[in-house]
Amino acid sequence: MKRFVRTVLGDIDPKDLGICDCHDHLIKNWGPEAKEHPDFVMLSNEAAIKECLEFVHHGGRSIVTMDPPNVGRDVKRMVAIAEQLKGKLNIIMATGFHKAAFYDKGSSWLAQVPVNEIVPMLVAEIEEGMDLYNYSGPVVKRGKAKAGIIKAGTGYAAIDRLELKALEAVAITSITTGAPVLVHTQLGTMAYEAAQHLIDFGVNPRKIQLSHLNKNPDEYYYAKIIRELGVTLCFDGPDRVKYYPDCLLAKHIKYLVDLGFVKHITLALDAGRVLYQKHYGLEKGKECFGFAYLFERFIPLLKEVGVSDAAINTILVENLAEILAFDAPRQFNPKAVHPRVLALKKQLKIE
C-alpha cells in the first residue's frame, strides 16, 4: 500500500507534510464551546489566512484542524481557506467527537444511534467526503473534501459512557480506514485510560495522539504512558501561562527526549480562541501572540534547555509524517477486543 496523508484538497505523500502543527483551529462556527466563552467563535477567513501565512513564513507546511462535526467545524469555509493557500500550506480536517459535555445525554445522535451505525457515518466522512451540514440532520450533503484524522474526547478525571461509546466508534473507524486518531483529554486527565481503551479495541498505538497532557504537568505520567502503551503525546500548549510556564513544558520535553522517547512527542499550538491568534486579535483591537510563537519563542527555548536540532526535527516533521499517514485498512474483529473494555462497556450499560 502506498502511504498517504489525507488533506482537504487531496492525498499527499507523507514526505510533503513538512513542519506540522498537529492540533489547531482556524475557523470555529459556534457550537457548544461558544456557550463557555465568546472567544470560541472564530469566523474570519481573512484573519485565518494571515495567521497561516505567518506560519508558512517561518517554515510551517501543514496544519491539522481538530474541529469535529457540530463542535465548530465549517467545511465550506475551511475548503475556501485551503484553496487560497494551495501550494503553500496543507490543511487536514477531522471527523469524530469531542467530550461528552458537548452532547445531550438523551437526544443527541451520539446517544441514540448505535455504534454499528455510527461507524459507517465516520467512515463516509473519510472515504467519500465530509457532510457540509455536520450531521446536524435531516439532510446529508457531502462535499469533495475528506477528513484525514478522527477525534475523540474525554472529560475531566472521568470517562463518560458516551465518551467510551465514541471511543469504540472511533477505534473501529480507525481500523476500517487506517486513519489516525487524536484524543482530547480534559486537562490531561484520563489519558492513559483513553489510549488503553482504543488499543483494547484494536487501534494501532502508533496512530494515537493524546492531546492536552501539558495541562497535567507530570513527566513521570508522560513516561508511563509512552513506555507502557507506545502512543504519542501531543503537547499543544506553548503560550499558556495560565496553566504553566513555557519553561516547564520545555523541560518535560527534554526529560522525555533524554529517556529515548523523542518518537512519541508532537507539538502544536491549539490556538482555538480569538485571543490566541495574532490576526484575530488585531481585528478585536488586541495585540496577541499567534502561530509564529512556536518558532519565535518556544523552539528557541527548547534549544536553550538542551533539546537538539535533530530531536526538534523529529518532533515537528518526522513523527507526524509517520503518525498521520494512513495504515492499510483492516477488518474489525470483535472477538479480538480485550475483555477489560468489554467488561467496562457492560458496567456502563453501553449496548
UniProtKB/Swiss-Prot annotation:
GO terms for biological process: catabolic process. It comes from the Bacteria. Its cofactor is Zn(2+). The keyword Hydrolase applies. Keywords: Hydrolase, Metal-binding, Zinc. Binds 2 Zn(2+) ions per subunit. The keyword Zinc applies. GO terms for molecular function: hydrolase activity; zinc ion binding. Pfam families: PTE (PF02126). InterPro entries: Metal_Hydrolase (IPR032466), Phosphotriesterase (IPR001559). Zn(2+) 2 binds at residues 151, 184, 212. Zn(2+) 1 binds at residues 23, 25, 151, 270. The modification N6-carboxylysine is found at residue 151. PANTHER family: PHOSPHOTRIESTERASE-RELATED (PTHR10819), PHOSPHOTRIESTERASE-RELATED PROTEIN (PTHR10819:SF3). Belongs to the metallo-dependent hydrolases superfamily. Phosphotriesterase family. This is Uncharacterized protein MPN_497.
